[in-house]
C-alpha cells in the first residue's frame, strides 16, 4: 500500500461500475477516471495526471480473444497492441501484480499476455477471431488501454493493465448489450428496453451477457482486493 502523501495511481476505465471497483473505498491511493467516449476519457485522464500521479493502470472489463478464456478470466498484460502500435507494460509492476494474483484464490483464472486495444466496439465472434490472429495472439480487447498507455508514456510514468473478460471469444454480443452505454460511461435502461422491443429475440443473448458480466465483475472485485492488500496495485 502507498505511503501517506504519495501520488495516486490513476486507474483508467470505460464504465462507471469499473471505476467504482478500481477506486475501492478511496483511501489507498487510487484515483479512477472513466468515460466511454475517447475524447471525454482523454480529458479526464489529462486532468488527473496534471494533479500528479505515480503510475497509470488500465483497469476494467474486456472482450475475450483467446479461444480458451472463460468469462471472469483475469489478464495481466505484458503489452498493449492497438491503434498507436505495441506498447510494453512496466515489467516489474506487471510481474508483481501477476505474482499477487497467482498466490491468491484467483490463480486459476489469471493469465499473462498481450491486451489488444481498439477505437470502436468489437462485438462479433468473427471479428474477435480475426483480431486474435492479427495481433499475434492477444488474449483480450478493450477500448481504453491504448489511451492509458499513450498518456503514461507521454508523462514518463509506469503503466500496467488488469482486465477481466466479459464476453468470451466465441460469443457475439447482441445489439441490446451496447444500447444503454452513454458517452460518459454510465448506463441507461430505456435504450436497452427499446432495443429488446424492436427485436425480442435478443433476450436470450442479453441474459448470457448479464451472466458473463457478473463473472467479470466478481473477478475484477476480487483482483482489486488482492492487489490492494498486497501493495501490487502500486508501482515501486
Residue ranges and their predicted role:
Residues 1-2:
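N-terminal hydrophobic/helix-forming segments and targeting peptides
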Residues 5-236:
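Glycine-rich phosphate- or other oxyanion-binding loops that anchor nucleotides, phosphorylated ligands
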Amino acid at each position: 500500500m502507498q505511503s501517506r502523501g504519495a501520488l495516486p495511481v490513476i486507474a483508467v476505465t470505460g464504465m462507471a461500475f469499473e471505476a467504482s471497483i478500481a477506486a475501492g473505498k478511496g483511501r489507498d491511493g487510487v484515483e479512477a477516471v472513466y468515460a466511454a467516449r475517447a475524447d471525454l476519457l482523454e480529458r479526464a485522464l489529462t486532468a488527473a495526471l496534471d494533479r500528479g500521479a505515480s503510475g497509470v493502470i488500465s483497469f476494467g472489463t474486456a472482450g475475450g480473444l483467446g479461444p480458451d478464456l472463460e468469462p471472469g478470466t483475469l489478464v495481466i498484460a505484458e503489452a498493449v497492441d492497438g491503434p498507436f502500435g505495441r506498447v510494453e507494460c512496466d515489467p516489474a509492476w506487471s510481474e508483481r501484480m501477476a505474482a499477487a494474483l497467482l498466490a491468491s484464490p484467483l490463480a486459476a483464472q489469471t493469465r499473462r499476455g498481450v491486451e489488444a486495444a481498439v477505437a470502436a466496439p468489437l462485438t462479433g465472434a468473427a471479428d474477435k477471431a480475426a483480431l486474435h490472429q492479427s495481433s499475434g495472439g492477444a488474449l483480450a480487447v478493450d477500448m481504453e488501454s491504448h489511451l492509458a498507455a499513450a498518456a503514461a508514456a507521454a508523462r514518463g510514468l509506469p503503466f500496467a493493465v488488469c482486465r477481466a473478460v466479459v464476453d468470451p471469444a466465441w460469443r457475439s454480443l447482441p445489439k441490446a448489450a451496447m444500447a444503454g452505454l452513454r458517452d460518459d460511461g454510465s448506463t441507461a435502461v430505456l435504450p436497452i428496453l427499446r432495443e429488446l422491443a424492436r427485436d425480442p429475440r435478443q433476450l436470450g443473448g442479453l441474459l448470457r451477457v448479464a451472466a458473463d458480466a457478473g463473472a467479470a465483475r466478481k473477478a475484477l472485485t476480487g483482483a482489486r482486493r488482492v492487489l490492494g492488500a498486497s501493495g501490487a496495485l502500486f508501482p515501486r
